[in-house]
């Protein structure tokens, strides 16, 4: 086998490990909302409104864990390397899922939720997003959007799995599953080589030249006609908040919206959540081809995502017909959850070149704000107006966020010619 082929195979396994970790994350993202009734019953709460508010608060603590950890994680991932952070994230996942299995009060579950958020963003996002981009730098956008594919596949499977094992005497199977997968992730992260770590080791052995990562950053800066302005810096970070705000709202509350606002049963709500995820999986492969093979500009993809997400959310709010909502939720999955968050990270790196761990940490910090803020206000609104009104109001907030994201994309598209000398319609190199 040629050296080039060996290198490709070597870091192909790194991508497989990244995707396995995010396949498991697909459960972490959904476990509280999908098992809502069984969780708050285990905590000793009998009132459904109070129970729903408590679960939303646990989800908020999960987001808070993301918020406080990811920026620091990104900085240390660049300094320490990808493997140590990936391994630490897997260990933390095993601990937090085990806590969720055994705790019998909401406060302790908030601790577990916080830990799971910190494990996801502070360790895995900080290490594995850069690792996906570094495995094959030319196809960084496709590598990163593949993360969304891994999450989305589990997003289809897990709600249906939960519906099958929702009975009180067997529902803990829904927690055993991520514990087993987390152990598998631990094994894979231990044995996986990562390009960034190998380059650091090579440099430490005496290579005094600029490493590939620094050379890539400098080349990107040199290719720009001028430095990005303050609004470009701010908008590319706020995009993370907006993408996460929309995606997290639909991901966490689609099932509850279907049951509370459309009158669906448990299986119908799970099916609605799965349709949302099917839309996202379809989009992942579609956009991977558009950006990987056809070399579409990631910002062009993001602009289209926001335009159609706005349309889908408007349909959900204006046409409360079950069939129409199913179609709209599928569209929302395709355009809002089909890699928009991951594509936004690539846009950030393109417009504001810098160390990938640092850029990932900054971007994911704003993502963490969205993941914290949304469930917190849903919890407060549920206590104030009941679940039905809270979820409808939340959909209105998602629509407003989508419109703002669309305006941000239009501004960045107008800046493309000034920064790069070409429009977003030109194929990427």
Give each language-model segment a name.
Residues 13-45, 250-255:
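Extracytoplasmic
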Residues 32-33, 229-277, 281:
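Extracytoplasmic gate region of multi-pass secondary transporters
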Residues 68-104:
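Conserved MFS/SLC helix-loop-helix module at the cytosolic interface between two early adjacent transmembrane helices
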Residues 69-81, 166, 283-297, 382:
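Helix-to-loop junctions at the C-terminal end of transmembrane segments
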Residues 112-149:
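Cytoplasmic helix-loop-helix junction between adjacent transmembrane helices
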Residues 139, 143-197:
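Helix-loop-helix hairpin linking two adjacent transmembrane segments in secondary transporters
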Residues 297-343:
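C-terminal transmembrane helical hairpin of 12-TM major facilitator-type secondary transporters
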Residues 350-385:
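A late C-terminal transmembrane helix in Major Facilitator Superfamily
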């Amino acid at each position: 086998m040629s050296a080039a082929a060996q290198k490709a195979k070597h870091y192909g396994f790194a991508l497989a490990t990244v995707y396995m970790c995010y396949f498991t994350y697909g459960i972490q993202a959904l476990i509280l909302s999908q098992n809502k009734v069984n969780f708050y019953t285990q905590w000793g709460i009998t009132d459904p409104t109070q129970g729903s508010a408590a679960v939303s608060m646990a989800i908020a603590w999960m987001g808070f864990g993301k918020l406080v950890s990811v920026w620091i994680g990104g900085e240390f991932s660049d300094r320490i390397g990808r493997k140590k952070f990936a391994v630490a994230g897997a260990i933390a996942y095993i601990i937090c899922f085990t806590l969720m299995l055994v705790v019998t009060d909401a406060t302790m579950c908030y601790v577990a939720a916080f830990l799971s958020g910190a494990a996801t963003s502070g360790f895995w996002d900080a290490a594995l997003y850069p690792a996906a981009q570094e495995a094959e730098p030319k196809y960084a956008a496709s590598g990163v959007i593949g993360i969304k594919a891994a999450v989305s596949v589990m997003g289809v499977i897990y709600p249906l799995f939960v519906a099958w094992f929702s009975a009180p005497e067997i529902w803990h199977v829904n927690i055993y599953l991520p514990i087993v997968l987390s152990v598998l992730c631990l094994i894979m992260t231990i044995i996986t080589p990562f390009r960034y770590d190998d380059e650091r080791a090579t440099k430490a052995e005496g290579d005094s030249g600029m490493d590939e990562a620094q050379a890539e950053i400098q080349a990107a800066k040199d290719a720009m006609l001028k430095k990005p302005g303050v609004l470009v810096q701010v908008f590319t970070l706020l995009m993370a908040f907006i993408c996460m705000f929309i995606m997290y709202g639909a991901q966490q509350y689609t099932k509850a919206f279907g049951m509370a606002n459309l009158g669906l049963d448990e299986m119908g709500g799970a099916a609605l959540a799965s349709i949302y995820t099917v839309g996202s999986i379809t989009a992942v492969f579609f956009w991977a081809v558009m950006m990987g093979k056809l070399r579409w500009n990631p910002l062009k993809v993001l602009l289209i995502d926001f335009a159609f997400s706005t349309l889908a959310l408007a349909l959900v709010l204006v046409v409360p017909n079950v069939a129409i909502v199913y179609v709209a939720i599928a569209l929302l999955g395709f355009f809002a959850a089909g890699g928009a968050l991951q594509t936004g990270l690539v846009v950030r790196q393109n417009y504001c070149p810098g160390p990938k761990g640092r850029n990932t940490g900054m971007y994911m910090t704003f993502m963490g704000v969205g993941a914290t803020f949304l469930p917190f206000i849903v919890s407060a609104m549920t206590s104030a107006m009941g679940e039905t009104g809270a979820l409808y109001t939340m959909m209105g907030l998602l629509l407003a966020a989508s419109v703002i994201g669309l305006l941000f994309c239009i501004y960045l598209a107008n800046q493309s010619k000034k920064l790069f000398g070409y429009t977003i319609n030109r194929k990427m190199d």
